[in-house]
Amino acid sequence: MTRLFLDVETYSPGLKPTYDDRIIAIAYKQEDGSVTVLKEWESDEKQILTRFLEEIKRIDRLSIIGHNILRFDLPLIINRASAHGIASTGDLMRLLLDPYPIDTIQAQLPANNFFFKGLGLAECAKRIGAETRTCPGSEIKTRYDEGDYTAITEHVREDVLTTEKLFNYLAQVG
């Protein structure tokens, strides 16, 4: 089984991200590899989605792991890729959902009385001693508008690494 850790950042003009927001960065990492960050500002959204999906197709026995990927990242990728005509919604769902994605936020729900509150990645990371020092996700739009792409790259990269640490912690404590 090849584990692939995933995080996506969007340009969200509103207070809360939506499935229609533009994807500005996709970061992923195979378990024994380094983090790859695909950046919209170096190409465009359609190109980074196409490259990511092509990479996924090449992986045998894939398991995609992320924090809140079942409620946000994967539906967002499916919606945006479909909107760009990269593939049909059905093909995208088979590609991304058939490998049984693992969502670290969902894995913690029973221990949190089935409430999502308090299960943000930064909060979970702090509890396991894996705190990050990058800009908060709420600043991504501002950083993008300012052209501070380094901060966004560091943020999405750290989110992937933190998700991997959280997954390994959850797997260890059972």
Predicted features, each with a name:
Residues 21-34, 61-174:
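Metal-dependent phosphoesterase core characteristic of DEDDh/y 3'-5' exonuclease domains
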